[in-house]
Amino acid sequence: MAEVELSIVMPCLNEERTLKKCIKDAQSFLRRKNISGEIIVVDNGSTDNSSKIAKQCGARVVKEARKGYGRALRTGFEAACGEYIIMGDCDCTYDFAHMTKMWRLMQSCDMVVGDRFKANLEPGAMSLSHRIGVRALSWLARRRFHSKVYDYHCGIRGMRRAAIEKLEFRTTGMEFATEMIALAELKGLKIKQLPVDYRKSVKGRRPKLNTIRDGFRHLDYILVGAMKPFWRDFWRLTGILLTSVLAGLGLLWLVAQIPREDLKENTQKSVDYYLNYDSGEMKPYLTSDYEILGKNLYGTMMDFYADSIWLSIAYSYDGSLRSVIESKYANVKEDSMGENLQKQLNGELEANEEYSRYWHGSLVIVRPLLKWFSVQQIYIIYGVVITGLLLAIILSLCKHREFVAAGAFAVAAIVAGAPLAAICLEYAQVFVVLGMVSLIAMRLVWRDKTKALPYLFFCSGILVNYLDFLTAETLTLAIPLLLALWLMRKQKLEMGGFKFVLKIMLFWALGYVLMWLAKWLIAWLALGGSAWQSVGAQIEKRSVSTEGGFNHFEMLGYAVDMNFSSLFPICFGSWAGLITAIVVCGLLLLAAKFPKKQLDWLWVSTVLIVSCVPLLRMLVLLEHEVRHFFFTYRALMALVLGFLFVIIRVVDWQRVKSCLKCKNRA
């Protein structure tokens, strides 16, 4: 077999309408120039007849199931045998039949990059937004990487194999085009440019390029992607945090422009509901007349006290940014919060107590809803949203044949009373964030984009701090991370994977803490030192306070007892608790007697560490866990889900099944 001189690599995703012409044109070029070459079509997950057509035309097909322009090209480069490589899109926008000039230039440099703007750019071949974006990003890249390349995004290029082997590619998407030139400049490779025609593709072809999404990926690489990992993460996180703080404050100011009068009718209906139900304080939503089931199911507590504060703050907004940061509510200690809210509506009491350490982000949702709905109706809306998100997680798992995980998640959600979280504005926010982050995390794992998980969890920490009332915020870390770990279980978790999980947890914690610090800092700058003193007092109160004369060990005992006894079905009484204990012990005995012989213990240990996050929270916020056990117990959903995942993975169910069959025969 003759030595291959030139490899022509074409990334392909559903290009059955254009692929044949591109291959034939490339073959024509190789014949005319008498070049010993090969044509490689990298099938990037096509669902049409692209692969079949490529084989029929004599091209070599290489499969790359992981989606991404960069992934496809990197796979094609690895498969190529030629001393020289030309890459080009197989959508008929580039002319493979006339590459003589490129071939000639390749003999005297390391890389040849096409320039579509100095040749024939066919009308309609490039949209106006695409044209502006390419020029702007290319201009920015030239200055960032000290380059003379004019068109950073041209899809047809030629290079020596030796030059490619010097470049350490990391990117997988469209930003690969920018990375290739940036790395070449960094390595000091000799780059030449060549004007190339750019034509319209066939009519009706769906473009693969998304101007906003892919433009942002190019911009991200230009600004921070080429940096060392630490600085890359630092600037990305800084950008996300600053954007989030400004957007969050801006949205609150925007909803503060809704006139109070527009909220008065539905706020009054809400107050009537609170006062008629239980004097505007707290009461379990579900009760029982049967002693064996327990008279009060505290896991269903409706915290009207907190919700009345919420509505009072919403009503106190006067359109100014200061009112947003102060987050004042009406409070006279002799009256219930429902009665205080009624007096505020009647004009008998002004909002007089600051809650600036939070400036409640969830009012971005609740305040506009109050314009059209009463609080009872808002509870229903939240119920539909939360139930929909929980079902979406279960159905997504089932769609990917993860039935066991779907069942475990459903059990954990029921045990922690997740479907009932919507009965109180205070609790609902966590489960909305949990649902959204879980769905995105699972999608990233399924699409093999796990590198984005740390940034997702950083955003999760920011968002839950912005929206939540310190209820069960760790669920937005633990549940999505446990689901991601389950989906990644088939890949043996090496130490690098364990460190990656720790990085995810660190990023979530950073997002949460930094958002809170940003809130406090803004409150301090706007309101003065009193805001910061309030923060310090609340931290001490919720963590190390031992009100009632109890020591820390007694408080810990109360926290454990009250939180665990609020879980379903333990909350139904001692008999239910005993049955639950028997089931748990039975599962542990199964794991001890029928363990799998080959087991990824690092994966198991990692799941257990993530599962214990709510217990760590209990130790840190001890007084808070005792005082507010009726909602903090929901954080234990992570412990339940992690326990079920570990049991499912550790137990050798085939051995259990065989043992049961033997006993039945006997």
Stretches found by the model and what they are:
Residues 390-393, 573-601:
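Hydrophobic, aromatic-rich transmembrane alpha-helices
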Residues 35-40, 51-79:
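Conserved donor nucleotide-binding strand/loop of the catalytic core
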Residues 501-585:
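Membrane-lumen/periplasm interface segments of specific transmembrane helices
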Residues 408-410, 598-622:
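Transmembrane alpha-helix segments characteristic
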Residues 25-35:
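Short, acidic, metal-binding catalytic loop of nucleotide-sugar glycosyltransferases
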Residues 5-7, 38:
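Cell-envelope/extracellular polymer assembly enzymes that use nucleotide-activated donors
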Residues 65-79, 84, 96-174, 201-219:
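Acceptor/aglycone-binding surface of glycosyltransferases and processive sugar-polymer synthases
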Residues 43-51, 92:
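A conserved acidic beta->alpha catalytic loop
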